[in-house]
A protein has these predicted regions:
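A surface/extracellular/periplasmic glyco- and lipid-processing/surface-interacting theme
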Residues: 7-48, 57-305
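Short, low-complexity, disordered segments immediately C-terminal to signal peptides
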Residues: 1-7
Length: 305
């Protein structure tokens, strides 16, 4: 579906659910969210349309949360960008992108390889919220109201994002029962369980709970198997920054409605869209709703039961 098809009442491009007037006339907002113990509990993840869980230095992960269909009163903690964000933001057209910390080296790929408008806490702190109940450097949070206002000041846009995935209410033909999924990273674990209505997330052995007391949930869970390249860059602790390659192809596992479809993801170039295919070349459709994508290094396989 093209972005032009995102009209009020029509399918939202990032969820497949009916679109609101506000969502039909604004770009996506990407936000870099921390995902280590010091950042917990996080906020706003259950209002994100799509969340990408991405490997970073030290075997941990960091999130790129994409907001569009809902207004959100609080999300975070917001942290620094990584090179892979540019490749994902390119899928969202003229998006806004919020992050904090890092260096101009982190910002380079965003400005060079995406059409996103960056909003950096270090430069414009007035667009962000500081919460004292989290320790430094996990205190920076945001709201859609403040960041959309900031984005409009910098790059006025009424263009919604193109669709990243396809959506359909019907269950894919040939889907197998699979109610539990674990994505094991080098130093982090994301585990999902189907409860009959949605997938609930555990992280590193504990229920993944948010500030509002809800457990992280999703309508769909997608596990993408990707190659990971050494960027040669190092973080402030001297640890090498990895680059998960989300341009190319690899295995994919799609979980919806307590079922699984295995196939292939394909994105042949930076400008190309992301496609999910079954083994016989049919498009894999997600259930309308919110989606988490576990971007898992191809040296590991998801555990499924």
């Amino acid at each position: 579906m093209s972005s032009a098809a995102a009209v009020a009442g029509g399918p939202d491009p990032l969820t497949g659910l009916p679109s609101s007037l506000a969502a039909a006339t604004r770009p996506a907002l990407g936000v870099k969210i921390d995902n280590v113990a010091g950042a917990w509990p996080q906020a706003g993840l259950n209002q994100a349309d799509i969340v990408f869980d991405l490997p970073v230095e030290g075997g941990l992960t960091r999130l790129l949360a994409v907001f569009h269909s809902q207004d959100v009163g609080l999300f975070g903690p917001i942290r620094s960008a990584r090179p892979v964000d540019a490749d994902l933001l390119h899928l969202l057209g003229h998006a806004y992108f919020a992050f904090s910390g890092g260096t101009k080296t982190d910002l380079g790929p965003i400005t060079d390889h995406s059409n996103a408008t960056p909003m950096w806490w270090d430069v414009t702190p007035s667009l962000f919220v500081i919460r004292k109940d989290h320790a430094v450097p996990h205190q920076v949070f945001g709201t859609t109201a403040m960041l959309y206002a900031g984005g409009e000041q910098r790059a006025p846009s009424k263009t919604p994002p193109p669709a990243i995935f396809s959506y359909a209410a019907a269950t894919p033909v040939g889907a197998a029962t699979a109610k539990n999924i674990t994505a094991q990273y080098d130093a982090a674990t994301g585990a999902w369980s189907w409860n009959g209505k949605q997938y609930l997330r555990n992280q590193s052995g504990h229920a993944d709970m948010l500030i509002d007391g809800s457990q992280v949930s999703a309508t769909n869970v997608v596990v993408m198997s990707v190659a990971v390249r050494n960027t040669g860059a190092r973080d402030s602790h001297g640890t090498v920054v990895p680059l998960p390659l989300v341009i190319g192809s690899g295995q994919v596992w799609v979980f919806r409605n307590g079922l699984m479809v295995k196939g292939t993801w394909s994105r042949p170039s930076e400008a190309a869209s992301m496609k999910l295919f079954t083994s016989n070349g049919q498009i894999i459709a997600l259930a309308p709703g919110r989606t988490w994508v576990e971007v898992l290094p191809n040296t590991r396989l998801p555990q499924i039961s």
